[in-house]
Swiss-Prot record:
GO MF terms held by the record: toxin activity
Cell location: Secreted
Tissue: Expressed by the venom gland.
S-S bonds: 71-82
Classification lineage: Eukaryota, Metazoa, Ecdysozoa, Arthropoda, Chelicerata
Removed propeptide positions: 23-48
Superkingdom as given in the UniProt entry: Eukaryota
Name of the protein described by the UniProt record: U4-theraphotoxin-Hhn1f
Source organism of the structure: Cyriopagopus hainanus (Chinese bird spider)
Main location: secreted
Stored InterPro entries: Hwtx-2-like
Key words, A-Z: Disulfide bond, Neurotoxin, Postsynaptic neurotoxin, Secreted, Signal, Toxin
């Protein structure tokens, strides 16, 4: 009985792994077809470009010397504004 259960579970695991691998290969083959536009890849490239431009802007803005505002009466300067402490 235990051997049968182990065999069934093993077959199920192999089937799941095989199905997953087949889906990955099919997705890769669709991306590699010559006639198809690479919209998925273009979206990834666009996202990376956006991330790069944002990080570059942060680096540029980070080098500027900002004058901290003076906050009074129990207020503390944080996040470019006075916050109650």
């Amino acid at each position: 009985m235990k051997v049968t259960l182990i065999a069934i579970l093993t077959c199920a695991a192999v089937l799941v792994l095989h199905t997953t691998a087949a889906e990955e290969l099919e997705a890769e083959s669709q991306l590699m077809e010559v006639g198809m536009p690479d919209t998925e890849l273009a979206a990834v490239d666009e996202e990376r470009l956006f991330e790069c431009s944002v990080s570059c802007e942060i680096e540029k803005e980070g080098n500027k010397d900002y004058k901290k505002k003076k906050c009074k009466g129990g207020w503390k300067y944080k996040f470019n504004m006075c916050v109650k402490v």
